[in-house]
Design a protein with these regions (language model features):
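Catalytic core segments in nucleotide and nucleic-acid processing enzymes
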Residues: 44-177
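Interdomain/boundary linker segments immediately adjacent to catalytic/signaling cores
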Residues: 1-40
Length: 177
């Protein structure tokens, strides 16, 4: 077949575009969550680069907040020896379709199992589907210590945001802004 587009090629273009769109949705969710964390710890920021915040906490220790591959956002304290104390592993599931939420929670569980093995103190999952049954999600991802809805984190008056803020500040040792 001399055509530029062979039938098999056409069959793979749709899934490739969808996969690319899903990556964009996931990246957007991570960026939003990172921005919320940044807002919470802004008084402790001493340096900032793309996807990374260097903080100084109340004990005068460096704390790193980074966008990473796995977990999506990691928060670590640098000990005086230079060793990293793994504080918080955050998985962000930015997809909005309810039909796939159980798969996303399963993906978060796999990531959190790795994070637990790496010594993270807390493992959190942020979901972007408001209809998510968080009790069911806890059964599906027992390694997740806390679940948050992205919509709650965007609502600074919500109980979910206040809990997220309090825990970030307590675990990092960064004063409230």
């Amino acid at each position: 077949m001399p055509s530029i587009c062979r039938p098999r090629t056409l069959l793979t273009i749709g899934p490739q575009w969808r996969g690319s769109a899903n990556v964009d949705i996931g990246t957007e969710g991570i960026d939003i969550a990172f921005g919320i964390v940044r807002e919470i710890v802004k008084l402790g920021i001493v340096a900032e680069a793309s996807g990374r915040l260097d903080l100084k906490n109340a004990a005068n220790r460096p704390v790193l907040v980074e966008i990473a591959a796995d977990p999506d956002i990691k928060i670590q304290e640098v000990m005086t020896s230079g060793a990293l104390r793994q504080l918080i592993a955050i998985e962000v599931k930015g997809g909005r379709d309810f039909s796939n939420i159980h798969n996303r929670i399963g993906e978060a569980e796999k990531s959190h199992q790795k994070a637990c093995a790496a010594g993270y103190t807390e493992c959190w999952t942020i979901v972007n589907v408001d209809r998510t049954d968080l009790h069911q999600a806890r059964r599906e991802s027992p390694s997740t210590d806390r679940f948050y809805r992205l919509s709650d984190l965007l609502d600074r008056a919500s109980e979910g945001y206040r809990d997220f803020q309090d825990r970030i500040q307590a675990l990092t040792g960064i004063a409230a802004s």
